[in-house]
């Protein structure tokens, strides 16, 4: 790249679903010579995670408004105004060529500050239903991108940027053909676990016995109780962990996944090429349900709403899927994936920054 390097500011925070896709795009552009800084909040996961990836981070003070009491609601305009002022000072100091909003509380004041400073804003919506912040910012953004169809009526569908180690996995036909033995079931409820999965899956193991083998991520603080449940039903042979560090290895091992349907999880499962049983978290706007719908419609997954999620239903479903069926579902999942999502988002940032 000739001349002065282009500068990107990424606005993302709160959860891995916002932060990890932002990191994927940041690393891609850094490899092309771009300078990248991050806008976040000091009390959320980005504060520790982003610097570990070699990216400097600036902080503003902002928190969510949903579900807060009357006093917090009344003080919200003042808090937002202060956050916008902080973000404007950061933008003027760094002078980015373009700002990427990936969602989270920080994107609202950050996006407004960028717009007030005349800096173009590119939004990326990870979920099938747009979040409140992105719905508002879409009015002032230069470009709106979406991972799944339907979040915004006219936005380009580019997928979710996912980790390179997941994209590097062998295709389903290479990975799954020739496998024998029990069906390998990977159970993941996110880094915090999911109580309904932890309570139900040991009972599924009891019903299916040696027809399946499990690798179960239970989440922080749940390991002892879940191990006790497996012991109670005589199923101590399964691999149970508080947290799985190498998700690519877990996806490579699995024949099928049982999990929540957060945006990043759904996108990783599609990129890996895996069948899934999705149990959407019960959001008011059914965000996780709509994330999972494209894979269910493609014949690659089954959605079980939480009130209907029980050991009998799951055991019957898994027992009905033989290896040829699982391979066909895996290939359908991979066909839905958008493996070049990172490149698509980066290309739009390059275009807007010219």
Curated annotation (Swiss-Prot):
Gene Ontology molecular functions: UDP-N-acetyl-D-glucosamine:N-acetylmuramoyl-L-alanyl-D-glutamyl-meso-2,6-diaminopimelyl-D-alanyl-D-alanine-diphosphoundecaprenol 4-beta-N-acetylglucosaminlytransferase activity; undecaprenyldiphospho-muramoylpentapeptide beta-N-acetylglucosaminyltransferase activity
Enzyme class: transferase
Keyword terms: Cell cycle, Cell division, Cell inner membrane, Cell membrane, Cell shape, Cell wall biogenesis/degradation, Glycosyltransferase, Membrane, Peptidoglycan synthesis, Transferase
Main location, first listed in the record: membrane
Top-rank taxon: Bacteria
A Pfam family the protein falls into: Glyco_transf_28
Any one annotated GO CC term: plasma membrane
Similarity field: Belongs to the glycosyltransferase 28 family. MurG subfamily.
Annotated NCBIfam families: murG
Name of the protein described by the UniProt record: UDP-N-acetylglucosamine--N-acetylmuramyl-(pentapeptide) pyrophosphoryl-undecaprenol N-acetylglucosamine transferase
Organism lineage string: Bacteria, Pseudomonadati, Pseudomonadota, Gammaproteobacteria, Enterobacterales
């Amino acid at each position: 790249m000739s001349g002065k390097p282009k500068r990107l500011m990424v606005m993302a925070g709160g959860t891995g679903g916002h932060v990890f896709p932002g990191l994927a795009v940041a690393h891609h552009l850094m490899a092309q010579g771009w300078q990248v800084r991050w806008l976040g909040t000091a009390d959320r996961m980005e504060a520790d995670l982003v610097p570990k990836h070699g990216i400097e981070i600036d902080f503003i003070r902002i928190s969510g408004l949903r579900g807060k009491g009357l006093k917090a609601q009344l003080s919200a305009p003042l808090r937002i105004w202060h956050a916008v002022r902080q973000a404007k000072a950061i933008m003027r100091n760094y002078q980015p060529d373009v700002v990427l909003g990936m969602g989270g509380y920080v994107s609202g004041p950050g996006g407004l500050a960028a717009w007030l400073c005349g800096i173009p804003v590119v939004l990326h919506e990870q979920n099938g239903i747009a979040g409140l912040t992105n719905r508002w910012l879409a009015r002032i953004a230069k470009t709106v991108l979406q991972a799944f169809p339907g979040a915004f009526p006219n936005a380009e569908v580019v997928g979710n940027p996912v980790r390179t180690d997941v994209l590097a996995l062998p295709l389903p036909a290479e990975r799954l053909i020739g496998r024998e033995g029990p069906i390998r079931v990977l159970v993941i409820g996110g880094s915090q676990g999911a109580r309904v999965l932890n309570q139900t899956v040991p009972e599924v193991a009891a019903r299916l016995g040696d027809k399946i083998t499990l690798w179960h991520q239970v989440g922080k603080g749940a390991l002892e109780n879940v191990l006790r449940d497996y012991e109670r039903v005589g199923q101590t042979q399964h691999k149970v962990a508080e947290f799985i560090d190498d998700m690519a290895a877990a996806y490579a091992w699995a024949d099928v996944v049982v999990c929540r349907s957060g945006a990043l999880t759904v996108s990783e499962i599609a990129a890996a090429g895996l069948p899934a049983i999705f149990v959407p978290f019960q959001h008011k706007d059914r965000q996780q349900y709509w994330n999972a719908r494209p894979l269910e419609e493609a014949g690659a997954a089954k959605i079980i709403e939480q009130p209907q999620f029980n050991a009998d239903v799951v055991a019957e479903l898994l027992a009905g899927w033989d290896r040829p069926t699982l391979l066909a579902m895996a290939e359908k999942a991979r066909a839905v994936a958008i493996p070049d999502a990172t490149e698509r988002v980066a290309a739009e940032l390059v275009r807007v920054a010219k």
